[in-house]
Amino acid sequence: MHSVETFNLPALNSLLETTARRFGNRLAVQDDNGSLTFADFVEKVGILSAKLRLVIKRGEHVAVQLPRGINYIVAAYAIWEAGGVYLPLDNQWPSSRIEGILHRSHVRVLIHTSQADQGLELTELPAETRAESPVAGTPAYIIHTSGTTGEPKGVVVSHESLIHLVESHQRDIYQAYDVTEGPVAINASFCFDSALERMALVALGYSLHVVSDQVRKSPYELVKYLRDNSIVNVDLVPSHLKVLLSAGLNEKCDALRLVIVGGEAIDAELWREIVQNQAIYINVYGPTENTINTSFCEIRGETPHIGRPFKNVTCLLLNENGERCAAGEEGELLVAGRHLAQGYYNAPDLTDRVFVHIDGIRYYRTGDRVRQNEQGNLLYLGRIDDQVKINGFRIELADVQHNLTQLPGVKYAAVTPIKLPTGQGLLASIVWNSDAPEQTFSNLEALLGEKLPSYMVPTRWQKLDALPLTDNLKLDHKSLLSHWKNSQEQIGEKFAAESISATEHQIKNLWQKILRQPSLSPDAHFFASGGDSMAAMTLLVELKKVTPQDVSLGDIFKYPTIRKMAAWLDASSVQAES
């Protein structure tokens, strides 16, 4: 314990107190377990903040590992009020990853759920020497993203940058499109940077509904939730939005006026589908290193783009020679301005490498290839490196590759991005060590899942005698993809003539379409065949169209093969008729 410091409240906390004085009895936050008015919310924040002030000093890191709900938001505001730095953790992450982040980030206190009464509990962690912030300014939070070394890197963002982002959204989006009140929803993971923008809406007086994990994973339940709670504004990644549109998002949610779409690129097909809807859809783009969002646009017209920068953001395009791009020339996007993050925690070399000074201005090198069209909008063209995005999460291929090569029996490994109907996926190509027994791909998947979050684990696997190289002796990703495609066609020929029932045939066709597999055995396992959470949600939507049986996400786990699911559906149909 130490003497309690005094200091001015961060801007968001000051806004929250002003809002609470104006709208004390108005709903502030709600989840499946209850709700809090603004008066109650501020009181709960104050109680937790007082406890934190007794054990932390200003600028110390406080990690939050809680079930999804109101308490995550309470914890963030309490940490800021106490002068701490908010560091969210995901309960779904492997324990080794969480322990590594706690250690490398020099976390002082962990906020978690009490086993005794399910309330909030503070656990002090061993005190260690803490690195200074990368640049001057008071840090607000640290968000971890995939790193090239096999360990996640922590992006440090200041209170100043966060409040500038909040002001940009309020001015350029919510006020500009006249969506300044009404219930709003947070769909993003609390470990995803866009969750901070959602959480900030509470300070601005919006009533924030926290969508539960169960509802988030069921397209029809989520659409029903948005409809029943008259949600006017929600955040979605494109791959999730695609599934929800198929589940009737536009037709069933009359109150929905504004959808914030971000986290990954929107393809032309989805863009055209969005244009036909009644609600306003805003495409937001930006790296975590520029405080969530850099540019935005309303989704309309024929060609996908990422719009123009917010008013307090500066963009610069450089070609391969490091020169400013001519009009219409593609190049790497660099961003500067008031949204810019402080850098990476305890990684000065990496910070200096990507946060650069040009003509006296500090820029972040995004690694994104863009081009500016004649209308002044930025067109996203891809990456200049090996970074990909899956369901909105950034993944460095080197991170996955490094962890793969640490697994028993693996001599060499390559990870290649692969386009799937549900979005981006990963293909793992493995060369076995001849001196060690071979592992099954299921075993490797399980072992990798102990080190990495599920969204970083490849869903496609293949065994090779050697990794193919180009003439320049670089890894040949095209050959890896070609080899995998050819092997899948051979599997398809093997099972094409297999005798199956009518229901099995129907399900088989759905699986092949969703998983983009030429053919599947009746005993093929949905998740072992490349299925992931987004593919499972797509399957729920497609099954709803062809069967009267209510199918949940749990049913896909319970009946994970074509044969088992068909037998269950047939048995359920017989029971319904009798």
UniProtKB/Swiss-Prot annotation:
Gene Ontology cellular component list: cytoplasm
Organism domain of life: Bacteria
In-chain residues carrying the UniProt-annotated modification O-(pantetheine 4'-phosphoryl)serine: 533
Keywords attached to this entry: Antibiotic biosynthesis, Phosphopantetheine, Phosphoprotein
Carrier domain mapped to chain residues: 498-573
Pfam family, one: PP-binding
Keyword Phosphoprotein on entry: yes
CDD domains in UniProt: A_NRPS
GO BP annotations, alphabetical order: amino acid activation for nonribosomal peptide biosynthetic process; antibiotic biosynthetic process; secondary metabolite biosynthetic process
One Gene Ontology term of the molecular function aspect: phosphopantetheine binding
InterPro entries on file: ACP-like_sf, AMP-bd_C, AMP-bd_C_sf, AMP-binding_CS, AMP-dep_synth/lig_dom, ANL_N_sf, PKS_PP-bd, PP-bd_ACP
Cofactor: pantetheine 4'-phosphate
Pathway note: Antibiotic biosynthesis
SUPFAM superfamilies reported in the protein's UniProt record: Acetyl-CoA synthetase-like, ACP-like
Role played: Involved in dapdiamide antibiotics biosynthesis. Activates and sequesters N-beta-fumaramoyl-DAP as a covalently tethered thioester for subsequent oxidative modification of the fumaramoyl group.
Protein family (similarity comment): Belongs to the ATP-dependent AMP-binding enzyme family.
Protein name from the UniProt record: Dapdiamide synthesis protein DdaD
Gene (UniProt): ddaD
